[in-house]
């Protein structure tokens, strides 16, 4: 839409494209900082660190060659709307406004980049399943609250569904015929672009800090030996980021379990929703890693390929690693 507006005013097509991409990057950086600082109440320093991990990562630099993937900069806006939906849940007017804004922003992401929309849906489904499992272990029956909301506000829920269907009809009218003709990939083609364990650290030979290590490991040599699309695998994380993530996994898990068992003994339920969401997000990131990783062609991504709608059209599934910079930035 911004590109079309610029072109309508006579801006050169290449300049219009560059302006939109730069604007996306700036907007993504600012909205991520706003999300971390204002919504998640993270300190200014760690909010800045989160922005760097998300918007100035090695993976972002590598993937900007595929300009559609810069739609990842829209994800913080989507999360802000979803967070605000729950934040103002008791206010009918604000809840409904943010509900429709959430649906609209996701639909716009679909129109901009199918990869980004698919990975967003996949992660949110993973997070929802993990969150329900964690909440159940806390004796916190979240589904009862969801069902109570649906029963009380069923007209609102129906309105969301109808609006969501209507707004994406043009997308699917265009996408489904093309997908049937050209989009479906064989699993054998996809698995060649799934990361091995070492690729979660593969920041490419062009990385100024760790590029020499990647070059020594000769990871690009797998193009000849295994037929792998090695240029798609350069979306790993730095040792510092991965180290922080692993540390926070154990630190947060220990803190969560201590508080959980104490609450279960005293109250019979652990109802700290903030901690439940945080630990669920950490678990979801590692579940996503497990789904992605492959060894000698064997990968749990096969279940995603078989069960998740639209998955056969995702040729370079390793790009999910790039999307995971969003939850990792929030966690760290």
Where do the PLM segments sit?
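Membrane-interface coil-to-helix junctions
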Residues: 1-29, 52-62, 66-72, 194, ...
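Membrane-embedded helix bundles of polyisoprenyl
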Residues: 20-22, 26-39, 44-135, 157-160, ...
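Transmembrane alpha-helices and membrane-interface helical segments
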Residues: 30-38, 77-85, 124-132, 241-252, ...
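Membrane-helix boundary/interfacial segments in multi-pass membrane proteins
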Residues: 60-70, 189, 193-196, 216-233, ...
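Membrane-interfacial, low-structure loops and terminal tails that flank and connect transmembrane helices
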Residues: 90-94, 135-153, 254-276
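Hydrophobic alpha-helical membrane-interfacial segments at the cytosolic entry of transmembrane helices
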Residues: 104-105, 128, 143-174, 185-196, ...
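Hydrophobic, aromatic-rich transmembrane alpha-helices
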Residues: 162-166, 235-278, 285-289
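Periplasmic/ER-lumenal interhelical loops and adjacent helix-loop junctions
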Residues: 169-253
């Amino acid at each position: 839409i911004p590109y079309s507006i610029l072109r309508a005013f006579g801006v050169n097509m290449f300049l219009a494209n560059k302006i939109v991409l730069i604007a996306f990057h700036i907007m993504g950086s600012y909205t991520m900082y706003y999300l971390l600082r204002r919504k998640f109440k993270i300190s200014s320093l760690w909010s800045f660190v989160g922005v760097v991990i998300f918007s100035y990562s090695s993976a972002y630099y590598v993937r900007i060659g595929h300009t559609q993937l810069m739609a990842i900069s829209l994800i913080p806006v989507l999360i802000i709307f979803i967070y605000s939906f729950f934040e103002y849940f008791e206010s009918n007017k604000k809840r409904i406004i943010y509900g429709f804004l959430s649906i609209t922003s996701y639909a716009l992401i679909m129109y901009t980049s199918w990869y980004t929309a698919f990975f967003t849906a996949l992660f949110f489904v993973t997070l929802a399943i993990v969150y329900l499992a964690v909440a159940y272990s806390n004796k916190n029956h979240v589904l009862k609250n969801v069902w109570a909301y649906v029963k009380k506000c069923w007209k609102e829920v129906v309105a969301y569904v109808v609006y969501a269907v209507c707004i994406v009809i043009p997308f699917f009218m265009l996408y489904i015929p093309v997908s049937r003709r050209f989009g479906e990939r064989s699993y054998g083609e996809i698995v060649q672009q799934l990361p091995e364990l070492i690729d979660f650290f593969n920041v490419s030979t062009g990385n100024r800090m760790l590029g020499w290590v990647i070059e020594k490991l000769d990871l690009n040599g797998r193009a000849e030996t295994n037929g792998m699309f090695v240029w798609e695998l350069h979306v790993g994380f730095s040792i510092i980021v991965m180290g922080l993530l692993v540390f926070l996994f154990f630190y947060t898990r220990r803190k969560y379990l201590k508080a959980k068992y104490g609450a279960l003994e005293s109250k019979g339920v652990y109802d700290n929703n903030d901690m439940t969401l945080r630990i669920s997000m950490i678990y979801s990131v590692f579940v996503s890693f497990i789904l992605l990783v492959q060894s000698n062609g064997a990968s749990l991504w096969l279940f995603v390929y078989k069960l998740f709608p639209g998955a056969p059209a995702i040729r370079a599934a390793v790009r999910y690693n790039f999307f995971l910079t969003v939850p990792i930035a929030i966690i760290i």
